[in-house]
């Protein structure tokens, strides 16, 4: 059967359209990976550029003020939020459940949070306390210990408030250059295990943080 010129043209247009769709899908996938895929090595360069652009100057200012290492803070922002601004938030259902248990008296405490801290907290407030905020993705309930407001760690003051929290909670470990412990503390609240096996959500969280630190140290 002979193919008419019109049919040939239609096949060409169909092929070209398919190629465009495939190219668009690849481009969208690549953009998403570079924005959200800070855990993929090819996207790390983009995460570093975003972190430098969005937070570099302010982090440097407050790192000097609180005597907390600049490379660590920058690496932590890249790990936790990919350098995005606004940094976004992440609700943790299991934390919400623990806080609700504390409020109802079924649990004596959750870390430093006691029932007295949650007496006036409604469900919306508990959800905010169970959500991580800002470039350092600090959990809302961490504010209670330092008498901060959630708006302090998610708004315009997020960088300063986050660095203050780090300074007061595990800043001594950073000043002693115990960076492996510091990354593990930020993510889990515990020192890096003596077994050598981290308990972070991402098994390579600490390793990536240390590697990012080296890159930021070279840029200074």
Stretches found by the model and what they are:
Residues 2-22, 27-30:
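N-terminal Sec-pathway targeting helices
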Residues 32-220:
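Catalytic glycan-binding domains that act on GlcNAc-containing polysaccharides
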